[in-house]
């Protein structure tokens, strides 16, 4: 999962908050209008509470845009003076943000949108997802696959998140960059951007659809008519100027720094004092609920009589008191020791070897474990006590020191505790140390207890221990002033580092006592904990990528794109802009008349989305070519051109990271990069898999893929005998289903009938409806309903199973996999039918998908252990849900194939046999 950065446009939210209360302004007892402050803070806390961002900052205008004013002296000249209440609010908002430890980004001579635009692009380049929090539509020009507009809720409406699709629909453009042309054409009265005379929103959309850009419009005014042509020809310079003024700058001298923008704990006392001064009682409660979910707020005192004092304004705005103050290092007794001498280190090692369970945590130089160097290691085996072992900078000396502690780390009798242990294991592997012994990872344990909550240590500490850990920023600072941990005084590093191990140790005690209560102990011990080492090994191994092949394939796709464009133009009888929905719609629906009743957008333009065009692809080759053109464009940019950038310079391989604590069903997720979504459905997409190759000519790739595992699981769990019998006879389950549903002999089932049966078979897991089936096939809705009814009549136990699962979820609030993994479903009792329906579908799907995830994890652990036990050179490289990919020496192939097949097919015993299909090739495509 990518990290997420939220950037707030301060003034846009402040003005919005101020005017939201314009009819009922918030005035405190001192006569101060606090509407702007309150509105802004509500928006900020809503984002933090709802989205739980990893990184966040607030951008302010400072002195206006010098560049735009130099370009156009009257830029924003007609804006009214800022209301006094807003001017007075700004210092308070600055003060609150500083107390919250939220970065304030401003630059003299630049506007907030330029700052946010620059930071967004920088963060996107660092593999972040960026959310621009603002109601200002101008930001739509910045939207991309990883940059989104986040429009806060207003007037009872929910928040809106605009991605590429939403921008395309709302502005009727092909590319978000065309929003600049749209804004330039129609102008902006608020900012005094002139635009083109006589061009409003509707006309701007039409012109953009016809011409694609401001420049193309101005170069082809001869195609316009009447007054519009005259207006535009006489104001071409205004058009160019307006587009320049509307363009958000991307070169502001600001820098996105990961550490500087990271969310951290606020100064609760400072925030409380400011809110007390402003008389923000309710906002304080909101603040505490956002940052301290376990805090208890005490109501203000009542008058002696038990009645509220009529004349006491203090009761309305009184500062609530925290009954349970947060603990921290300064108010909690602790004893942390430094082991920085040979004698201290020897004594520490002796103590470690006497323990049965120890928590440890590494301090390093890099978040990428493959490139990280040790700065120090902290140890704890009793609450509020611990040790810090600092490491020298020189690799040789550091290796010598870690060698001294190898007997502890590789002692199988001593259990190791940590938070995100996989990272620590990989760091120690850099020094040749293989951690042994049972593993207890608090992050994974908490995921099993509460999969929908965040699992980082600071949040867990605040929630379960009522303790605020030392912020890393207090040691090394943020942004440009950030220093290396090696330069921090050793006593300060000791306090910070050992506290991490201490907190993790205490969390272990909390979670260890809770896990048996929710049936989580066994699945942790037998599955998730052993999997840590398996995933660490896979991540460290990486996979070989044929970069040269992808570069050549990129050229092939360029040629395909050009060929498709030529073919489309020939079929249309003219050249036109494929990126223009207006021109495309006119060609398809007016000139070629592919539909007698074409759908239109709200503005009257022809709809040309994939959903609209897909039904015409079979009958009209031009439509098929257009859809293919779009697919090729996306394939090239998302995979073919992007994957080579992910190759590690030191290893020459691509290293993904597998996350155990993301998907609620228990599935693994892959990121940086995501190797679980490599295309497979189309011939062109399949070529991307061809780029994943064996280590060298002496190796091959082995793919092992479970055959229809989810259908086998649902057949077994539902005890549906007809389906079980088909699997036992090793029949093609989709052909068998078609024979039963359509009442024809097995050998007479048509390809179309099998296809419909396959759609229903897989759709049943996700609660397919007649409407959904109709959309996926050529069946009418009534035919789809009849097919589903016949399906359930053929497999009656499936319907019973689905009903039982939903009833179980209603009664218990969760469902379980075959290993007891729970998926909690709080929305199962929702009064909203749509929300409740989603929970009901999850009640059916989660045990099936989760059980499949459990089974392949069992297989992965067994295979990993057997490869090690037999000292084979084969390595497991990838897990893509139901498929495993291995790098196998050709000399080991006949040993490994039966080993893998047996481990996968015997991972779990069901009423239906598990089947793993194996394939071998020099690349992933050939092996699959």
Predicted regions and their residues:
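Extended, highly charged clamp/arch subdomains and adjacent linkers
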Residues: 1-60, 64-76, 88-95, 236, ...
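Extended two-metal-dependent nuclease catalytic cores across DNA- and RNA-processing enzymes
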Residues: 2-3, 23-27, 77-253, 462-464
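Conserved RNase H-like, two-metal-ion catalytic cores of nucleic-acid enzymes
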Residues: 6, 16-51, 55-57, 73-74, ...
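Short hydrophobic beta-strand that contains or immediately precedes a catalytic carboxylate
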Residues: 7-8, 134, 358-360, 439-440, ...
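Short alpha-helix plus adjacent loop in nuclease-associated cores
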Residues: 74-88, 144-173, 229-230, 387-405, ...
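Conserved "right-hand" nucleotidyltransferase catalytic core of DNA-directed polymerases
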Residues: 235-392, 410, 419, 452, ...
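Conserved catalytic core of nucleic-acid polymerases
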Residues: 483-486, 490, 533, 540, ...
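C-terminal polymerase-core module
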Residues: 559-566, 570-624, 793-845, 891-928
């Amino acid at each position: 999962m990518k990290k997420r950065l939220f950037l707030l446009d301060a003034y846009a939210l402040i003005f919005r908050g101020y005017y939201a209360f314009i009819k009922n302004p918030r005035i405190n007892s001192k006569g101060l209008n606090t509407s702007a402050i309150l509105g802004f803070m509500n928006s900020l806390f809503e984002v933090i509470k709802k989205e739980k961002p990893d990184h966040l900052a607030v951008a302010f205008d400072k002195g206006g845009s010098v560049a735009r004013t130099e370009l156009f002296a009257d830029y924003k000249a007609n804006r009214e003076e800022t209301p006094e209440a807003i001017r007075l609010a700004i210092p308070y908002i600055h003060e609150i943000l500083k107390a919250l430890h939220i970065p304030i980004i401003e630059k003299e001579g630049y506007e907030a949108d330029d700052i946010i635009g620059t930071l967004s692009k920088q963060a996107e380049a660092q593999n972040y997802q960026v959310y621009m929090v603002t109601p200002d539509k101008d930001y739509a020009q910045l939207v991309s696959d990883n940059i989104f507009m986040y429009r806060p809720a207003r007037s009872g409406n929910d928040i809106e998140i605009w991605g590429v699709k939403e921008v395309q629909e709302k502005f009727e453009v092909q590319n978000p960059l065309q929003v600049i042309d749209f804004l330039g054409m129609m102008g902006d009265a608020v900012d005094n951007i002139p635009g083109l005379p006589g061009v409003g929103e509707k006309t701007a959309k039409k012109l953009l659809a016809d011409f694609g850009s401001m420049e193309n419009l101005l170069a082809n005014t001869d195609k316009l008519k009447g007054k519009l042509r005259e207006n535009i020809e006489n104001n071409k310079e205004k058009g160019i100027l307006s587009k320049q003024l509307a363009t958000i700058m991307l070169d502001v001298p600001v820098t996105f720094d990961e550490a500087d923008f990271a969310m951290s704990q606020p100064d609760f006392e400072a925030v409380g004092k400011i809110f007390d001064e402003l008389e923000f009682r309710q906002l304080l409660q909101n603040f505490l609920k956002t940052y301290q979910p376990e805090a208890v707020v005490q109501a203000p005192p009542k008058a002696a009589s038990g009645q509220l004092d009529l004349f006491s304004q203090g009761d309305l705005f009184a500062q609530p008191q925290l009954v349970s103050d947060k603990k921290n290092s300064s108010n909690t007794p602790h004893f942390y020791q430094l082991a920085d001498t040979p004698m201290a280190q020897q004594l520490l090692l002796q103590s470690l070897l006497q323990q049965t369970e120890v928590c440890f945590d590494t301090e390093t130089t890099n978040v990428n474990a493959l490139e990280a160097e040790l700065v120090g290691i902290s140890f704890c085996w009793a609450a509020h006590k611990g040790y810090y072992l600092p490491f020298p900078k020189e690799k040789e000396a550091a290796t010598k020191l870690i060698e001294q502690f190898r007997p502890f780390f590789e002692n199988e009798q001593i259990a190791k505790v940590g938070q995100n242990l996989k990272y620590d294991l990989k760091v120690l592997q850099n020094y040749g140390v293989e951690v042994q012994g049972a593993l207890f990872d608090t992050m994974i344990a908490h995921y099993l207890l509460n999969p929908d909550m965040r699992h980082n240590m600071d949040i867990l500490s605040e929630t379960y221990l009522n303790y605020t850990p030392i912020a890393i920023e207090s040691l090394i600072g943020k942004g440009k002033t950030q220093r290396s941990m090696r330069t921090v005084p050793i006593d300060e590093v000791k306090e910070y580092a050992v506290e991490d191990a201490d907190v993790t140790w205490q969390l272990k005690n909390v979670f260890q006592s809770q896990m048996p209560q929710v049936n989580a102990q066994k699945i942790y011990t037998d599955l998730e904990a052993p999997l840590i080492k398996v995933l660490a090994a896979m991540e460290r191994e990486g996979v070989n990528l044929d970069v040269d092949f992808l570069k050549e394939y990129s050229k092939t796709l360029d040629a395909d794109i050009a060929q498709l464009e030529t073919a489309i133009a020939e079929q249309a009888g003219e050249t036109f802009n494929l990126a223009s929905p207006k021109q495309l719609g006119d060609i398809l629906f007016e000139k070629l008349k592919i539909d007698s009743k074409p759908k239109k957008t709200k503005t009257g333009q022809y709809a040309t989305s994939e959903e609209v065009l897909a039904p015409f692809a079979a009958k009209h080759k031009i439509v098929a070519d257009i859809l293919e053109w779009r697919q090729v464009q996306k394939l090239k940019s998302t995979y073919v051109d992007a994957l080579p950038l992910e190759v590690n310079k030191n290893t020459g391989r691509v290293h993904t990271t597998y996350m155990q604590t993301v998907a609620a069903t228990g599935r693994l997720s892959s990121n940086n990069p995501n190797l679980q979504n490599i295309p497979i459905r189309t011939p062109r997409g399949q070529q991307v898999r061809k780029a994943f190759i064996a280590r060298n000519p002496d190796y091959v790739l082995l793919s092992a893929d479970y055959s229809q595992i989810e259908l086998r699981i649902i057949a077994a769990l539902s005890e549906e005998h007809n389906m079980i019998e088909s699997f036992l006879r090793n029949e093609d389950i989709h052909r068998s289903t078609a024979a039963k549903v359509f009442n024809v002999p097995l050998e007479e089932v048509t390809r179309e009938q099998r296809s419909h049966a396959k759609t229903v078979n897989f759709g049943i897991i996700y609660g397919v409806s007649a409407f959904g089936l109709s959309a996926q096939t050529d069946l009418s809705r009534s035919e789809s309903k009849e097919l589903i009814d016949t399906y359930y009549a053929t497999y009656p136990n499936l319907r019973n199973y689905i009903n039982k699962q939903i009833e179980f979820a209603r009664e218990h609030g969760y469902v379980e996999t075959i290993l007891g993994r729970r998926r909690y479903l709080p929305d199962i009792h929702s009064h909203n039918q749509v929300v409740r329906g989603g929970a009901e579908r999850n009640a059916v799907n989660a045990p099936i998908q989760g059980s499949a995830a459990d089974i392949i994890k069992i297989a992965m652990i067994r295979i990993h252990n057997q490869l090690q036990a037999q000292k084979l050179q084969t390595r497991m490289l990838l897990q893509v849900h139901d498929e495993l990919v291995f790098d196998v020496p050709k000399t080991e192939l006949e040993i490994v194939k039966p080993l893998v097949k047996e481990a996968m097919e015997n991972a779990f015993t069901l009423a239906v046999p598990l089947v793993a299909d194996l394939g071998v090739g020099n690349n992933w495509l050939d092996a699959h």
